[in-house]
Amino acid sequence: MLSKIMLVEDDFALAMATEYALQSEGYQVVCADNLQKARGILDESVDLVLLDLMLPDGNGYSFCKEIRDGGFEMPVIFLTAVSDEANIVQGLELGADDYVTKP
């Protein structure tokens, strides 16, 4: 069972709502609102990464690639408002396990 989820999301309200929902289900959630913070959090203890695509200091594609190039095998799920097929395919090709569009 997953226990530690890293949420990389720069929309404060969405991050807080997602964090609350996950914590109420018993998950430990660590949040980052940019890639610099996410890089500082990422380690083997993270069981799942929920990753926004558009962030203030880069994009989720590059971080997903960094995760995979670094040998990390935890699932990565894009959680983003960008829903066109080309972006979904690109995310999956870079190693994401799933791609969920947010409202």
Regions found by a protein language model. Give the residues of each.
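N-terminal/domain-start alpha-helical segments
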Residues: 1-103
